[in-house]
């Protein structure tokens, strides 16, 4: 796909509500589009942590809209915006590195849960034979495919777009798309767990566990470090309120503990530590924005009563 020019200023973003009224559907996920907006901005920096050259195309395709956050925002809004920009850039780079580490270890099957407008299939240097599955709602994938179809270069792996609602039964859809549960898989749950209830998050991770062969890997974010008062504050700031209203919190307990009880060996690292290592520190006055969790399904180990499907 040809590298589109990034729109300068990047102050416009059409909301999910506007697109939904026009299309008679939910439209493009607001969080997915906001993430693309931030990734496009990061990609313009001389010290960028990654180059998401497709993100500007997604933002441009969204059409005219009010600014997500005005570029000259100051005060608390500006501080929150700075924190979120840094956090999402660091999160993206961290999970880039985790997926590539899995590939280097020999994993050739990758699943991006709630993939949104993720472009890793196109921008990461995947080894030959890599099969990547993007799972998300039909309306989001339809928008994404429309933008991708306008380009000239294909993905750098075998890419499968799987339309499914992760709060419902989705395993059949990914199996029908060619997913092989007997093979080790690198799973990524980026920007999804916190928007699920505890019950929904546990059900999703249970399904992931059931579909994971020994040697599989899982990466996700756990937002237990995000202060509740910060979420409540965001509810009262118009550009951020709709995102805060989507917040459900995810698992009730710590993710590594849950994973350990279900046949995974996991660890977590706080995002501020990662940010410091990447020389993109999150503003000191902000609390820890969240934790990044990585886990591996030990070879020869399965949770009691589990078996590979397919």
Curated annotation (Swiss-Prot):
Top EC class for this record: transferase
EC number: 2.1.1.-
Region Disordered, annotated ranges: 1-28
InterPro entries the UniProt entry points to: Ppm1/Ppm2/Tcmp, SAM-dependent_MTases_sf, SAM_mthyl_Trfase_ML2640-like
Pfam families in alphabetical order: LCM
Compositional bias per record (Basic and acidic residues), positions renumbered to this chain: 9-24
Keywords: Methyltransferase, S-adenosyl-L-methionine, Transferase
One Gene Ontology MF term: methyltransferase activity
GO aspect biological process, one term: methylation
Positions bound to S-adenosyl-L-methionine: 136, 165-166
Keyword Aminoacyl-tRNA synthetase: no
Similarity-based family: Belongs to the UPF0677 family.
Role: Exhibits S-adenosyl-L-methionine-dependent methyltransferase activity.
NCBIfam families attached to this UniProt entry: mthyl_TIGR00027
Name of the protein in question: Putative S-adenosyl-L-methionine-dependent methyltransferase Franean1_4929
Protein source organism: Parafrankia sp. (strain EAN1pec)
